[in-house]
């Protein structure tokens, strides 16, 4: 290793280089590119200097379109400008990319390349986004791994300045952007020597200046437009040599050889793969292995994709090549081939001795590519007629594009590399601990290190698998670990759900966090699990990290215990030295959370090493027989064939045929109910003797895992053991039971916290103690549907309505889901939902687990997601589409009244026409009308037509859901337009005051003083008052609510909003894990109450109907604040951490925040006529 070595991921490497060359960064958060901008923002806040002696000026915009516009403007003003983006965000920049390229401006777009949303959304890596901008005129430079991101990102900036062409500098999303590697860092002093100062001076002089003004962006006619476009050709013709020159200089600095196209392999290769991105490292491993066995193969790795230089291409490709396979990580439906393949075929167009060239697609949406997949490509090239247009790594049994597996398993050498896998659960700290571990190994030892983290889409409580490799040589294996030396599991429930030991080498080590004794292990471990441990001579250890963490006061955060145990077992470095390093990491990671938290975690490190228990594996485990398979319960095909394999982490094995009939992205509702994840450590247990039957616990439950049930006498007598009940208050004919699903509960504890009963009618107990209650839950859900004996617009009555949102993947204690669940209880059987991309779309529709469900009649919310930026328009379009069909129905029904129909049908049609826009009673009217049409339609075309459209008889309740990032920022223009349209749509904004889905970035909803990403020193601008802006139209129903503060007001506002025959907007305060509640998310509802009592959040409603009635339309539902505003702020880490680091600044900003809140409250009082 020469030079300074540091452990970092691809995003950090790109940020490090770009910071040096950047004066202005205009950004907008989007996964997986956001950490690049976050790094830049953090360094700028710390005063870090770029090459020009200044901190970077970073500006978060309202959208990627806005970011691209700001990039364009800053470049025209003469500042070196950069942005960071991916996927749909990059596509929003396309119009400005054309402009920036056409105006020869040296901007750089760093892209962590990601899949595009087509029939579904996918946040993982491929090249669909970058291939969609190859026509813009921007140069395109690709990197294969983290080290190349460090080295070649500099080339993008340097060549942009010298060549006057903007660059798209890209690398694979997640696989490179989030992979942690130990790499050599280029120092700014080195980069400064490469900068072409005269070219930079020329750029500055060419900027827009009033001292020597010019005009740019003229409107041109056909006479000159074409010629001026062609005049720019010479810049593109010169660019490849400029890039090659800078690559030569970088190579001289680093000792790593770079060219526009890098060839590696046999000098006389006959078969060559051409590719770009992280797959090249996998291909390289295969090439080395095959050549060592005497074959003649090679790899041509593409770096400069645009402009595509034929001279440099042929200079690198061996003359001996006879067959070429081109790998594209994108899909262009209808094209003859994918882009890189077309370029390669075109390169040989005039060559009489051209090799045979085939192309294939691989790794769309982050699919893993293994060495055996690449071996299959080389096998394909050996065939007399190689398959063209193939797919890699899947089984296509529909259109038969997939390559068959390699003829024999390829044994790629990983000698000297130790591979470790860590199974964890989102929010249990496993990923964070492993990031600390890999940095300790990388930065504190001579070893090379690599880490990659795979996740599912659940917000927390989902599965995570950390893949760590370390060894005495560079590690370039960009795929998941399938042969491990060490495996750890932090969740004991996983032993029954996943094949944890798959790939663990003979003699390897397995560490399990569990509370089981050795005797209990015999009972709980599956037979196949025990057999593998015994037959493969596995070293098996357990650690009761849960109980130790609880005793230490760490709750469910036992990550440090497990990490310390890993260091002791792995023996990579001296355990005591490792413990010291871990303790230092704790101080750095948890410094903002106070001395007590630091001390608890440091003590956990000590106990993690001291409390390990080695299990003596009984000899008889090796000869255990698999028990007879039990007959599975009847289940839908989708559950058996798709959901269950995916939930076992076997989705990669599903063939294309599994999705025939789902090609448009349609998934069935209600699939989350089949998961039964059992992720809670503790779950609530009903104590009927103290229960007041208020149903508040069900009202606020984020996962709909608590539900009141009414049993008639027969059902009560037939109830299973364990079903407790008491006489129902207000419904004497029934027994009341509070059903709790232990396997669907996330264990947040909000139900216990808000229970008003003296002594609490709910108590938390361990999940294991309540598993036997699952049949009781099933029985309660299967009870006969009953008419609600209470008004459903009351807190108590609403909870006797079936929730049509259940068991989502939202965080424990989520502040968003209770609102959505409540709305489904009120209107769910006739709802259409347009959902903006964000947290609510991820917990709302992460395949295959869909929490939106149906009632006993099969009715429920129909849900769809378009994009982040267009959700309001999308929802309006839904409403207009349904409205158009219903207008046709109304016309046909009016005509049908002239037909000789029965009085019953005539009356049903008249009633429908008179009340078609009324929600109350719409289902009953629709049912009656459908019934009469079915009886009389035969032989009457008009009635037949009406009956065919019967699904539209029910008045639909159109809802538009989204977070504050959508409503306040990227989607605000569309939201404003929809509100101004006057159309009858209902909008619900989950206001978490940050971009929750991308990790807590600042939005225009973020108040002054809050620390958020892109507001590292506290936000300085006032929170936008979205409600007041909407209210200015006069005909929009607007409400601000906080369920935890006033459940009745929340319910009233939602009911009024839906009933208002025009646009309505409900802004709902939602506590979020990003707020860092010191009381924990078990108090998220209480936090909303504190926010209102302190005057931080205000409750109000604006009803246009009241003005028509001569009343004040604005109703202030909040009382005068009585609690301490400052104490409320200090109860959340997002505010308290600023006070810890810079108390004087925090005090000043806290005062501003409180003044803003008081000013808003005073204004609300005036509007309500209280002053």
From Swiss-Prot:
Which SMART domains does the entry link to? Answer: EKR (SM00890)
Annotated catalysed reactions: oxidized [flavodoxin] + pyruvate + CoA + 2 H(+) = reduced [flavodoxin] + acetyl-CoA + CO2
InterPro entries, per database record: 4Fe4S_Fe-S-bd (IPR017896), 4Fe4S_Fe_S_CS (IPR017900), PFOR_II (IPR033412), Pyruvate:ferred/Flavod_OxRd (IPR050722), Pyrv-flavodox_OxR_EKR_sf (IPR037112), Pyrv-flavodox_OxRtase_EKR (IPR019456), Pyrv/ketoisovalerate_OxRed_cat (IPR019752), Pyrv_Fd/Flavodoxin_OxRdtase_N (IPR002880)
- Where does the record place the 4Fe-4S ferredoxin-type domain? 682-711, 736-767
Listed binding positions for [4Fe-4S] cluster 1 are 691, 694, 697, 755
The UniProt annotation places [4Fe-4S] cluster 3 binding at 811, 814, 839, 1072
Task: Tell me which UniProt keywords the record has, alphabetically.
Answer: 4Fe-4S, Electron transport, Iron, Iron-sulfur, Metal-binding, Nitrogen fixation, Oxidoreductase, Repeat, Transport
| GO MF annotations in UniProt | 4 iron, 4 sulfur cluster binding; iron ion binding; pyruvate-flavodoxin oxidoreductase activity; thiamine pyrophosphate binding
Pfam families, per database record: EKR, Fer4_7, PFOR_II, POR, POR_N, TPP_enzyme_C
| E.C. designation(s) | 1.2.7.-
What CDD domains does the record tag this protein with? TPP_PFOR_PNO, TPP_PYR_PFOR_IOR-alpha_like
Residues annotated as binding [4Fe-4S] cluster 2 are 701, 745, 748, 751
Q: Which GO terms describe its biological process?
A: electron transport chain; nitrogen fixation; response to oxidative stress; small molecule metabolic process
Give the record's cofactor note, including how many are bound.
Binds 3 [4Fe-4S] clusters per subunit.
Q: Which SUPFAM superfamilies match?
A: 4Fe-4S ferredoxins (SSF54862), Pyruvate-ferredoxin oxidoreductase, PFOR, domain III (SSF53323), Thiamin diphosphate-binding fold (THDP-binding) (SSF52518), TK C-terminal domain-like (SSF52922)
Q: Which cofactor does it need?
A: [4Fe-4S] cluster
Homology family: Belongs to the pyruvate:ferredoxin/flavodoxin oxidoreductase family.
According to its UniProt entry, what is the function of this protein?
Answer: Oxidoreductase required for the transfer of electrons from pyruvate to flavodoxin, which reduces nitrogenase.
What is this protein's record name?
Pyruvate-flavodoxin oxidoreductase
According to its UniProt entry, this protein's organism is: Klebsiella pneumoniae
- Its gene is nifJ
């Amino acid at each position: 290793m020469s030079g300074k070595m540091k452990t970092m991921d691809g995003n950090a490497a790109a940020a490090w280089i770009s910071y040096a060359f950047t004066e202005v960064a205009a950004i907008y958060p989007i996964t997986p590119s956001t950490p690049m901008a976050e790094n830049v923002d953090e360094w700028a806040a710390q005063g870090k200097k770029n090459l020009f002696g200044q901190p970077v000026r970073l500006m978060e915009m309202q959208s990627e379109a806005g970011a691209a516009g700001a990039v364009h403007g800053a470049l025209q003003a003469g500042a070196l400008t950069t942005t960071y983006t991916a996927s749909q965000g990059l596509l929003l920049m396309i119009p400005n990319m054309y402009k920036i390229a056409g105006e020869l401006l040296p901007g750089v777009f760093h892209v962590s390349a990601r899949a595009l949303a087509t029939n579904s959304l996918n946040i993982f890596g491929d090249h669909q986004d970058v291939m969609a901008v190859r026509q813009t005129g921007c140069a395109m430079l690709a990197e294969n791994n983290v080290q190349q991101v460090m080295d070649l990102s500099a080339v993008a900036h340097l060549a942009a300045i010298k060549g006057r062409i903007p660059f798209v500098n890209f690398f694979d999303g997640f696989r490179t952007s989030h992979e942690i590697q130990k790499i050599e860092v280029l120092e700014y002093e080195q980069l400064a020597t490469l900068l072409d100062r005269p070219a930079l001076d020329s750029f500055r002089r060419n900027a827009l200046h009033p001292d020597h003004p010019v005009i740019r962006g003229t409107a041109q006619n056909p006479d000159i437009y074409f010629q001026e476009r062609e005049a720019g050709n010479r810049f593109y013709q010169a660019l490849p040599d400029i890039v090659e020159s800078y690559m030569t200089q970088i190579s001289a600095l680093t000792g790593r050889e770079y060219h526009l196209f890098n060839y590696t392999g046999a000098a006389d290769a006959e078969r060559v793969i051409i590719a770009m991105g992280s797959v090249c490292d996998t291909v390289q491993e295969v090439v080395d292995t095959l050549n060592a066995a005497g074959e003649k193969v090679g790899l041509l790795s593409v770096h400069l994709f645009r402009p595509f230089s034929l001279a440099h291409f042929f200079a690198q490709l061996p003359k001996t090549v006879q067959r070429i396979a081109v790998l594209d990580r994108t899909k262009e439906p209808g094209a003859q081939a994918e882009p890189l393949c077309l370029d390669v075929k075109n390169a040989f167009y005039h060559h009489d001795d051209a090799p045979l060239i085939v192309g294939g697609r691989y790794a769309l949406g982050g699919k893993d590519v293994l060495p055996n997949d690449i071996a299959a490509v080389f096998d394909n090239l050996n065939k007399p007629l190689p398959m063209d247009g193939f797919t890699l790594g899947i089984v296509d049994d529909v259109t038969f594009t997939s390559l068959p597996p390699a003829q024999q398993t390829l044994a790629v050498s990983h000698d000297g590399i130790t591979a470790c896998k860590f199974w964890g659960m989102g929010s249990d700290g496993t990923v964070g601990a492993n990031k600390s571990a890999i940095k300790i190994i990388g930065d504190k030892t001579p070893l090379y290190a690599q880490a990659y983290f795979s996740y599912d889409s659940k917000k927390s409580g989902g599965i995570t698998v950390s893949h760590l490799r370390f060894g005495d040589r560079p590690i370039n294996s960009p795929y998941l670990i399938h042969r491990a030396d060490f495996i750890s599991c932090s969740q004991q429930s996983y032993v029954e759900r996943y094949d944890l030991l798959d790939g663990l080498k003979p003699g390897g080590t397995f560490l399990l966090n569990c509370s089981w004794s050795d005797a209990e292990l015999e009972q709980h471990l599956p037979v196949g699990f025990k057999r593998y441990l015994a037959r493969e001579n596995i070293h098996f250890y357990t650690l009761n990290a849960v109980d130790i963490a609880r005793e230490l006061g760490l709750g469910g955060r036992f990550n440090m215990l497990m990490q310390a145990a890993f260091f002791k077992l792995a023996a990579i470095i001296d355990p005591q030295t490792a413990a010291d390093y871990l303790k230092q990491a704790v101080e750095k990671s948890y410094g903002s959370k106070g001395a007590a938290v630091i001390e608890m975690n440091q003590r956990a490190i000590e106990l993690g090493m001291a409390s390990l228990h080695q299990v003596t594996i009984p000899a008889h485990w090796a000869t255990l027989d698999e028990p007879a398979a039990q007959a599975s319960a009847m289940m839908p095909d989708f559950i058996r064939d798709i959901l269950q394999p995916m939930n076992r982490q076997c989705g990669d094995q599903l063939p294309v045929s599994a999705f025939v009939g789902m090609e448009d992205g349609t998934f069935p509702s209600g699939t989350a109910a089949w998961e039964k994840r059992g992720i809670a450590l503790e779950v609530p247990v009903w104590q009927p003797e103290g229960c007041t039957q208020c149903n508040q616990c069900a009202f606020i439950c984020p996962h709909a895992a608590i539900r009141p049930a009414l049993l008639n006498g027969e059902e009560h007598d037939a109830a299973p053991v364990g079903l407790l009940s008491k006489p129902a208050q207000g419904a004497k004919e029934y027994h009341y039971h509070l059903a709790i699903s232990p396997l669907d509960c996330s264990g947040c504890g909000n139900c216990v916290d808000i229970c008003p009963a003296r002594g609490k009618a709910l108590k938390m107990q361990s999940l294991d103690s309540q598993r036997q209650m699952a049949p009781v839950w099933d029985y309660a859900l299967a009870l006969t549907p009953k008419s609600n004996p209470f008004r459903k617009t009351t807190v108590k009555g609403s909870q006797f309505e079936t929730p049509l949102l259940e068991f989502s993947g939202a965080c424990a204690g989520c502040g968003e889901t209770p609102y959505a669940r409540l709305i489904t209880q009120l209107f769910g059987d006739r709802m259409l939902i347009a959902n903006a991309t964000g947290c609510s779309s991820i917990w709302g529709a992460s395949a295959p687990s869909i929490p939106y469900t149906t009632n006993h009649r099969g009715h429920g919310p129909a849900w769809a997601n378009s994009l982040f930026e267009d959700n309001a328009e999308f929802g309006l379009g839904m409403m207009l589409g349904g409205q158009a069909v219903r207008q046709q129905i109304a016309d046909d029904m009016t005509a049908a009244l002239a037909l000789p129909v029965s009085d019953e049908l005539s009356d049903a049609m008249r009633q429908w026409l008179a009340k078609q826009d009324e929600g109350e009673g719409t289902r009953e009217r629709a049912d009656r009308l459908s019934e009469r049409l079915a009886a009389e339609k035969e032989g009457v075309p008009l009635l037949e037509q009406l009956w065919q459209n019967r699904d539209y008889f029910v008045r639909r309740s159109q809802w538009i859901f989204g977070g504050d990032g959508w409503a306040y920022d990227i989607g605000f223009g569309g939201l404003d337009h929809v509100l101004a349209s006057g159309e009858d749509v209902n909008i619900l904004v989950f206001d978490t005051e940050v971009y929750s889905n991308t990790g807590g970035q600042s939005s225009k909803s973020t108040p002054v003083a809050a620390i958020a990403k892109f507001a590292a020193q506290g936000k300085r601008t006032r929170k936008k008052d979205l409600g007041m802006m909407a209210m200015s139209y006069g005909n929009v129903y607007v409400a601000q609510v906080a369920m935890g503060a006033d459940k009745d007001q929340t319910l009233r506002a939602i009911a009024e909003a839906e009933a208002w025959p025009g646009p309505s907007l409900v802004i709902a305060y939602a506590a979020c894990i990003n707020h860092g509640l010191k009381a924990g998310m078990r108090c998220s509802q209480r936090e909303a109450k504190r926010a209102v009592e302190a005057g931080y959040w205000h409750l109000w409603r604006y009803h246009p109907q009241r003005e028509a009635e001569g009343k004040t339309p604005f109703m202030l539902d909040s009382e005068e604040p009585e609690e301490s505003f400052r104490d409320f702020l200090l109860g959340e880490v997002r505010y308290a951490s600023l006070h810890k680091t810079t108390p004087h600044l925090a005090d000043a900003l806290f005062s501003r925040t409180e003044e803003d809140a008081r000013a808003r409250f005073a204004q609300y009082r005036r509007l309500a006529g209280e002053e």
